[in-house]
Design a protein with these regions (language model features):
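Active-site phosphate-binding/coordination module
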Residues: 1-92
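Short active-site oxyanion
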Residues: 6-11, 30-32, 118-120, 175-177, ...
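Short loop/helix-cap segments at secondary-structure boundaries that form the rim of catalytic
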Residues: 25-28, 45, 132-137, 189-191, ...
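Short hydrophobic/aromatic-enriched beta-strand-loop microsegments
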Residues: 31-37, 52, 97-98, 144-145, ...
Length: 228
């Protein structure tokens, strides 16, 4: 809210769905622009202002591959504009989606998704380590990246594309943007903004790539507000 009072937009940038993100930031949601689904969907003032869907045939092919080549350990989520379509095996994905507050629907085949697909993800309840090399190089054309300890994402958008869309819409210079990231799916965003920060807990190659480190974004933002 203090940022907004100074004319600065705060933008949660996440792989999460809009409904989940808005609930998470409910007290200040009207002061935010929401970069959802890793840049696949952008919301402002409760309206979708930009969307970057995947080619339908490719999205379905990726979903089937993630499902069949994850050794019975992977559960697949296909993201629409504001609904998650779940191919689940009872291994924990559904409980996680319910916990974070997503709108969701259970499906049995990617062809059942009734809208444009913005992201395809696999949830690996034992962790992504054994599957990173299996999926990330294969689906590089769809920006395949590790998105946390249990998730691998594919999308034709990325956080960088999302940030560019926001800056164009709100007439903001990328050089005036500060961004915080902690994983490889943040690189496209961190590489284009004027002031990128990497979190202290990020992987070593990311900490080496970016000189600005912090344990908490709040610390940096409080200092920024003091000086501005």
């Amino acid at each position: 809210r203090a940022l907004h009072q100074r004319g600065i937009w705060f933008c949660p940038a996440s792989g999460r769905q809009y409904t989940s993100l808005r609930k998470l930031f409910a007290p200040v949601a009207d002061c935010c622009v929401f970069l959802c689904e890793n840049g696949g969907v952008i919301y402002k003032d409760e309206q979708c202002i930009a969307k970057n869907p995947m080619p339908r045939a490719l999205a379905e092919e990726i979903a089937n591959d993630l499902w069949t080549r994850s050794d019975g350990q992977g559960e697949v989520m296909l993201s629409g504009q504001n609904t998650a379509y779940l191919m689940e095996r009872g291994l924990g994905m559904l409980k996680r989606i319910q916990f974070i507050g997503n709108n969701y629907q259970i499906i049995h085949d990617p062809s059942e998704v009734p809208e444009e697909i913005t992201k395809v993800s696999v949830y690996l309840h034992e962790g992504v380590e054994s599957y990173t090399e299996r999926f990330v190089p294969r689906w590089k054309e769809a920006n395949c990246a590790v998105a946390g300890p249990y998730w691998i994402d594919t999308t034709f958008a990325n956080k960088g594309i999302g940030v560019r869309s926001i800056c164009k819409t709100l007439d903001i210079d990328l050089a005036d943007v500060m961004a915080f990231g902690d994983n490889y799916n943040d690189v496209s965003m961190l590489d284009i903004v004027g002031v990128p920060y990497i979190m202290d807990g990020a992987a070593a190659p990311l900490r080496e790539k970016y000189p600005n480190h912090t344990p908490r974004p709040e610390d940096v933002l409080r200092e920024f507000l003091k000086q501005n």
